[in-house]
Structure formats: structure tokens, C-alpha cells
């Protein structure tokens, strides 16, 4: 009788979180099958033409250490040669490449040119204040300057210019169009229009597409508020070019859309990050199909907010996973030192007012000074909204809890 109860108790413990794999299973799989993140990406390019990389929070600057390291690898220029980003209107593609390929300029002159370009506005907000964009453009310029093979940058976002926006009504008209437009499908269409004009390298066209994770995943479904189907950029990419030609890879993050201002909803209730700790945080890349990582529930949205995805696993929305840095090392960085010059301030005030009157029509006061400070003053903070020590304690608690369950199950199963 005791043996029956013991087995029953062990089964109950094991079934407490049926959708969450064990730390042990995750660790063993990644330790055995994981390869270096760069090698993983280049391995995908051997069989596929397009790799969509789902980045974390746009503010996270740490992820661009890996991205720039990938682009700096000589294999990228030789075998791929083209990188595309969600950030940046397609209409600025030629101009940004002239900037990145300037050869007879000092670093000081380049930074002046970079700031002049950036002030034009790469997107439909008054200014893109995320520091990692400057980090990326500056890094790509340095890579191109050192190499005879230049990497071409394609900008895939909507065609937009602040020069064509003169009144609140102008901006409202554009803003309303965003809700009527499947931006994800346009991100794909803009990419496709540039991709088909690429010069093949060794007979094939290859491309790395960097876009935020909610856009990168592959998902389509009916979105009630818009009364129509909605497909993510990743879904459109696979539909346009085919499953085998497109591979979607996500960077490790947390279940950001479950964040309530206080918690830190780690993926798989924290077991992914605990497994990474067992590996001494050794970076790795793995496929997601038919393994404990892929079998973990996906708890995110599609397209940056239109709809929350239910009943799907990670292997249903992405092909691969890269762990490049532990969660507690992710850093959010906003503000670009000196971007708001005295000469540029009237223009940024104009844009800010148009934006605020459109996005916050009930507000009677436009917070000009606060906005300018956000654009102009560099600030860094943990991307998880919690300190490094707090995140480590949360991961340690997950480890301790699962060890206790494993020990209890083992003791019950070994009981006479």
C-alpha cells in the first residue's frame, strides 16, 4: 500500500507543472547539442537563405554585442553580405548605406554625419531614443571600414519622412493608418522588394533580418478588434519564401508581456535560466524542434501587441534559440548624448508636439523638457526591471525548488 501511495505522490509532484520541462532535461540537451551562437547561425545559412533573428526589448544593448560580433566574422561578408532591420524606414536605405560605406573620413567626422542622419528620424516617432541603434550603426561602419567586402544594410519599416508632416492632422492621418495596415506584412514586403535586387553570392542570395521578437515569430490568427486575420512578420516571411528557406531564431528573454510592473516572468517559470546557470552561462544556439526547449509553452503576443497567443509551444513559433547572455546581464539603454543640439531643438519640439497631440489628445500640456531629456541624456538600467542580485535570487529559488522536488520523487521511488 505504501509503495502505491509513494508512486502516486511522485506522480503528483511530477505533474505539478506539466508544461514546464525539468532543469535537468534542459541542461542536458543544451550541453550536448548546443553550439556557439555564431556557428549556429552560419550552420542555418548552409541550408536556408534567410535567417530572421528575433531580438529582445528594443532598449537592450547587450544583444548587439552578439549581433556585431556575428557581422564582424569574415564569414558573414563572404557568405551573406546583407543585413536588414525592422528599425528604419525603407526610404532611408540608400542614405544609410552611403553613411556606412564612407571611406575617407575620420571617426569624428563620421559621428557628425551619423548624428545628422539620425536627426532626420528613422521612424514615425519624434526620435528613436534607443542607444543600441547608434551602437549598431557605428559598429557596422567600423566593420565595413576594415573590410574590402562591404555589408549592405536594408531598412524594412514603413516609408515615412518628418518633412512631409506639417500639421497635427497630417500626423493623425498617418497614425490612424497604422491601425489599418498590417505593418508586419509590409515589413516582409519591403524586405522582399530589396532582397530580390540583391546580387547573389556564389549563386544564392542570403540575408539576416533583425526584428523584434513579437514580429519575428511565426503566427497568424483572427484579431477581433480589427475584424480580420493578422500575421506576424515571421509568418509572412515563411509564407512568401517557404518554410525551408526561412529560419526564425529568437534570443533569450523573459515573458515580457506578463510583466505587471513588479514581477519578472521568466521563460518556463525560470527553468530555462536555471539550466543556463548550470552551464556556467556558456552561450549556445540550438534548434527548437522536438526537445525540452521547444516543448515549453510560449507565453507572448504576436506583432507587438495585436493578440496574445494561447495554446502554442516555442517550437510552434520559432525554429531556433540563442542564449547569448544571462538574463541578469541584459541592459536597457536609452538616450543619445548630444543628439538634441541647439539647432535641432526647435524641430524635435515640433515633432514632439505633433506626436503628443495625436497619441495623448486629452493632455493639455506637452512635456517637452522630459522628452528632450529622454532623447538626449544616456540612461541605463536592468532590462528586466530588477537588479542583477534580485534576478539571481529568483533563479536560485527555481533551482532549489526543483531540486527539492527531484529529491522527494527519488526518495519516494526508492522507498521499500
Regions found by a protein language model. Name each.
Residues 1-9:
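Bacterial N-terminal signal peptides
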Residues 14-416:
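Compositional signal for N-terminal targeting/processing segments
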Amino acid at each position: 500500500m505504501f509503495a502505491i501511495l509513494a508512486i502516486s505522490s511522485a506522480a503528483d509532484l511530477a505533474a505539478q507543472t506539466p508544461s514546464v520541462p525539468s532543469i535537468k532535461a534542459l541542461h542536458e540537451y543544451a550541453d550536448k547539442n548546443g553550439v556557439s551562437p555564431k556557428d549556429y547561425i552560419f550552420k542555418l545559412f548552409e541550408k536556408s537563405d534567410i535567417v530572421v533573428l528575433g531580438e529582445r526589448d528594443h532598449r537592450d544593448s547587450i544583444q548587439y554585442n552578439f549581433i556585431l560580433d556575428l557581422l564582424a566574422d569574415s564569414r558573414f561578408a563572404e557568405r551573406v553580405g546583407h543585413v536588414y532591420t525592422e528599425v528604419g524606414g525603407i526610404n532611408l536605405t540608400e542614405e544609410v548605406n552611403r553613411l556606412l560605406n564612407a571611406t575617407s573620413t575620420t571617426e569624428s567626422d563620421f559621428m557628425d554625419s551619423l548624428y545628422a542622419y539620425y536627426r532626420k528620424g528613422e521612424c514615425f516617432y519624434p526620435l528613436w531614443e534607443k542607444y543600441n541603434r547608434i551602437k549598431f550603426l557605428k559598429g557596422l561602419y567600423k566593420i565595413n571600414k576594415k573590410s574590402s567586402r562591404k555589408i549592405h544594410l536594408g531598412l524594412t519599416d514603413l516609408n515615412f519622412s518628418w518633412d512631409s508632416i506639417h500639421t497635427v492632422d497630417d500626423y493623425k492621418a498617418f497614425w490612424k493608418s497604422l491601425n489599418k495596415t498590417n505593418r508586419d506584412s509590409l515589413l516582409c514586403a519591403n524586405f522582399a522588394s530589396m532582397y530580390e535586387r540583391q546580387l547573389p553570392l556564389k549563386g544564392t542570395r542570403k540575408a539576416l533580418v533583425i526584428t523584434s521578437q513579437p514580429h519575428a515569430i511565426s503566427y497568424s490568427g483572427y484579431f477581433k478588434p480589427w475584424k480580420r486575420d493578422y500575421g506576424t512578420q515571421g509568418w509572412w516571411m515563411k509564407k512568401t519564401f517557404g518554410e525551408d528557406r526561412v529560419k526564425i531564431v529568437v534570443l533569450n528573454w523573459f515573458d515580457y508581456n506578463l510583466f505587471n510592473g513588479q514581477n519578472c516572468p521568466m521563460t518556463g517559470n525560470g527553468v530555462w535560466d536555471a539550466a543556463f546557470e548550470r552551464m556556467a552561462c556558456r552561450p549556445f544556439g540550438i534548434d527548437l524542434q522536438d526537445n525540452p526547449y521547444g516543448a515549453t509553452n510560449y507565453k507572448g503576443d504576436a506583432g507587438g501587441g495585436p493578440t496574445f497567443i494561447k495554446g502554442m509551444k516555442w517550437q510552434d513559433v520559432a525554429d531556433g534559440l540563442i542564449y547569448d547572455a544571462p538574463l541578469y546581464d541584459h541592459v536597457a539603454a536609452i538616450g543619445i548624448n548630444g543628439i538634441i543640439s541647439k539647432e535641432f531643438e526647435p524641430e524635435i519640439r515640433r515633432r514632439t508636439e505633433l506626436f503628443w497631440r495625436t497619441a495623448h489628445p486629452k493632455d493639455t500640456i506637452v512635456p517637452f523638457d522630459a522628452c528632450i531629456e529622454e532623447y538626449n541624456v544616456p540612461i541605463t538600467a536592468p532590462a528586466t526591471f530588477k537588479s542583477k542580485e534580485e534576478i539571481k535570487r529568483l533563479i536560485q529559488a527555481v533551482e532549489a525548488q526543483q531540486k527539492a522536488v527531484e529529491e522527494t520523487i527519488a526518495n519516494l521511488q526508492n522507498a521499500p
